[in-house]
């Protein structure tokens, strides 16, 4: 059996992904990175609706038979973002064990307490993440760009205490997350999207706002100041974090001394507004932006 130092996590006690029996459902990039990360830390089993297509022998030997899943008692189930709990082969099993479902973001948070900027929203996530990453890199931060942008968060290597993360998070990832926290959270905008997955607009909005729900006092959330769906949700709930409303239409106040043409294009003005507000909170060197 595995033996690791017990690690306490503020708010949730001991690390819940050490020395456990874990099922990873979905063998795309996210699922495979979770397997590689956890395989020497816990007893990990794999399943995918299309597992018969898997050729890698190291992966195949960890795949559990469909029938054996129902005979097993798992401590945690890590669900890949692409798995729709209502349409997959293990739908009934997952609904019965909903309290055991976690995301790769949760696994990351259990092992690392690094500062993160986590960006979500209906539009502009990738552009804003890339821009934030470039700015931090230019200012000599040890920074990783991960998440829905294409690099699974658990595939990050050479992580130090000072490593800073820029994370693109989709509603699918956040929907399954339970314990993940980010010191800096960003909701760029919200409009009806992925309703075929979330079933209702309200559930889609709630998934996005999980990012703020788990934040603590001393954390910061940046949101579009005139977004109707965002403001409605803010009125309905109280959050421990400090809410910073970003005026995306008054970009001129940020650009007085900026010559970078990227910031001046209309398409990037809204994204740039968020980046400037976050940079201000991080006390970044304005000359280098």
State what each model feature region is.
Residues 29, 123-127, 269:
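Residue-level detector of alpha-helix initiation sites
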